[in-house]
Amino acid sequence: MNRRTFLRHSVGSVAGLAALSGCIGTPGDSGQTLTVAAYSSFTGDGTAGNWLKSAFESENPETTVTFQTTENGVNEFIQRRSQGAPIDADLFVGLNTGELVRADQQLDDSLFAASGDRIDGSETVKTALDFDPAGRVVPYDTGYISLVYDAEEVDEPATFDTLLKPQYENELLTQNAEGSDPGRAFLLWTINQKGPDGYLDYWNQLTDNGIQILSDWGTAYEAYQDEEASMVVSYSTDQVYYHGDDVDISRHQVGFLNDQGYANPEGMAQFADADNPELAREFMSFMLSEKAQAEIATRNVQFPAVEGVDPGGDFGEFALEPPEAVTYSYDDLVGNVGGWIDDWARQIVSN
């Protein structure tokens, strides 16, 4: 289950999600149609996708925005390209660094077009979030992977080594890095801390101390809510959802190991085979506008990518940023990330 899908259900919103590769939105009788590929939880009632569709169409009445949704992320389009099948979309929204690396390594020609310098507003994106050296992907938000913990049950662990102490035995839930974004980010964070030569030894120690590796974020967070453990790998925006008089805030404390959080920016990119490349770039520019950035942050529960945007409200009050953000760059991951994950899966998950 995707994090945003789970959270929308948990707070009582109507899901209204499309099926795999389904299209949302009906083209008008005239004008242009922009087809945006995105993960399914980007669309539906109350989502960033539906707000963007409505607002963009209001400003561009001759344009219809449709969503092509996928549970398999960019992998579906990598497969289409490798098989010579049509992409049938103009723009992909929701791309992260590892997915871009995968697309570039598996395909002879780029799946995406270079368009970053032609996107109005791209110069306002926080420099630290840029992750495509070829200028194809423009970040539109970011999250920070952290721990969420129950302060009534455990003290905040200060460092990665603290997690190995006896008082944290059987207390940490995480996700499988083979298929989960936060799980992969947490694994990469441990590699960043322990090095490519030391991370597997560290994970062996975590395993000995009872870490539980579950399939995805939703499964892990449900287990945390069921009090199967006192800590879970999650996002530093946890309290945006979980606060108020009817919430035990002690169970939604955010912990930054080593005073850090792992930055996991999301980006958008125009497909190289886009039927409407100029319209795709206009939509990308619209997503970087101050109003859109505030709406995306609030509805995705992620931080804005653009400098100086304050979403305000509950987000402004309860979203926590780490003292230091760490992440791996595109160049760091090329030729490495696949092997790191494969070795981890073979030695840790399979045992």
What are these regions (language model features)?
Residues 31-101:
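Early extracytoplasmic/lumenal segment of secretory-pathway proteins
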